Amino acid sequence: LPFIDNKTTMAADSSSTVMELLKLLQDRSDLTLLTNSAEAIHVLAQSEIKVVSTGGELNKNTLSLQGRITKEIISRYHVDIMVMSCKGLDINSGALDSNEAEAEIKKTMIRQATEVALLVDHSKFDRKAFVQLADFSHINYIITDKSPGAEWIAFCKDNNIQLVW
């Protein structure tokens, strides 16, 4: 995973896609993770990763911590990279999500990160969702499972986004 090999601090959202990445990293004793994911906190409790919880109110549907306290805690930290997923990607609108509370937490994490990586499967490209999460000027990497097509490849190249599939 070259995009995170030299990173020592990371923020992660509560998406199932990012959870799969975190499982691959659990032997990294040099990594500190800031997350609002109750699942990540639980799963990584026995790992080598140093886990920092954001605190906040638990959303039982998403198993994520949310609210004012969560945003305040995130704002106290700075991370090398923030990894997140989203519900859709639109060339004109950017990264989109379906839950406003989740989007606010992710936006706070983005502000506290040097770099941002989007982990999305191929179905998210050219897909709209309810809430604007981030425009592409905030995204450094898009990691996906299949080639998204010529238009997206050119768009990422033109916007200095490293596209990995």
Task: Enumerate the language-model features and the residues they cover.
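Conserved phosphate- and dinucleotide-binding cores of soluble alpha/beta proteins
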Residues: 39-165
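Short N-terminal secondary-structure initiator segments
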Residues: 22-35, 161-165
